[in-house]
């Protein structure tokens, strides 16, 4: 448990705060990029990770009878909602189960089920999530995924925010919302820096915490760290370099991410000691230390555009302005001190 102990965070004075019994909407985003999972298959497989996520979902639903969940999968081909299913699918399946149970006449024994003792809501979520996720994986062009090596993480965040906006803010339901992103870490995720940051700003405005659980040995994702920091979420890197093993994913999920946002001021949570706040270049999509900023739209560039136009607002820069940017800073000559 020392791996998730946030000793750097001090407990806040919350004596005047009162807890309420408000239900919570949890939107879980699952990375379904198969080539990335193949790189860490010796540590954990995608089926094992999904099993841990389902245990976490059931624990969330068990905390409050009005809690709800939304599951989204994404890969290089795009993002799609896995749960809840399309309208009518879940209700039809529930009716079929009820009809089968009611069709048993008096004096007859009902047919035994493999998971008869399982809570119906847990069973429904487990079946739908697994079925929809495997359908998504089976209909994915893996040849194209190998070539692209990127993901639709911004599209998945947009789906999650849209679902939350519809079921929490538009319907005016008395419910809190948060997002949990399970990612393996892709080499070219910085390509989606701009649309992802737009989603982060939207979540920050709506006061929706974004939690990130990163698996694998890859480097930390800069914009995901920024997302957790700006939305008061939790960022946890589960990899061997941090003395953590993905084999214990269910333990990390239940220990670090199960707490409701209303309870987080009262407990010690995993913290980020070093957050990289550098931005990404709008041209090369790479993180930069020093760059140029457009005076019109604040676009960040690591190099001067060859066509002398801003890649975002299409503003044309004058040659005089660009010539001044290419010059090295002038050094003041030191005056010689003449000794008397």
From Swiss-Prot:
From the Swiss-Prot or TrEMBL record, state where the protein is found: Nucleus
Tell me the keywords, alphabetical order.
DNA damage, DNA repair, Metal-binding, Nucleus, Transcription, Transcription regulation, Zinc, Zinc-finger
Q: List where Basic and acidic residues composition bias occurs.
A: 92-103
Q: Which Pfam families match?
A: Tfb4 (PF03850)
Asked if Transport is a keyword of the record, the answer is no
Gene Ontology molecular-function annotations: zinc ion binding
Please name the GO terms of the biological process aspect recorded for this protein, alphabetically. Answer: nucleotide-excision repair; regulation of DNA-templated transcription; transcription initiation at RNA polymerase II promoter
Q: Which Gene3D superfamilies match?
A: von Willebrand factor, type A domain
User: Where is it predominantly found?
Assistant: nucleus
Q: Which GO terms describe its cellular component?
A: nucleotide-excision repair factor 3 complex; transcription factor TFIIH core complex; transcription factor TFIIH holo complex
Alphabetized InterPro entries for the sequence: TFIIH_Tfb4/GTF2H3, vWFA_dom_sf
Domain of life of the organism in this record?
Eukaryota
Is the keyword Zinc-finger assigned to this protein?
Answer: yes
Renumbered to this chain, region (Disordered) spans: 85-117
Q: Where are the zinc fingers (C4-type)?
A: 294-313
Instruction: State its role.
Output: Component of the general transcription and DNA repair factor IIH (TFIIH) core complex, which is involved in general and transcription-coupled nucleotide excision repair (NER) of damaged DNA and, when complexed to TFIIK, in RNA transcription by RNA polymerase II. In NER, TFIIH acts by opening DNA around the lesion to allow the excision of the damaged oligonucleotide and its replacement by a new DNA fragment. In transcription, TFIIH has an essential role in transcription initiation.
Question: What family does the database annotate?
Answer: Belongs to the TFB4 family.
How this chain assembles, per its entry, is:
Component of the 7-subunit TFIIH core complex composed of XPB/SSL2, XPD/RAD3, SSL1, TFB1, TFB2, TFB4 and TFB5, which is active in NER. The core complex associates with the 3-subunit CTD-kinase module TFIIK composed of CCL1, KIN28 and TFB3 to form the 10-subunit holoenzyme (holo-TFIIH) active in transcription.
Q: What is this protein called?
A: General transcription and DNA repair factor IIH subunit TFB4
Q: Which organism is it from?
A: Yarrowia lipolytica (strain CLIB 122 / E 150)
Q: What is the lineage of its organism?
A: Eukaryota, Fungi, Dikarya, Ascomycota, Saccharomycotina
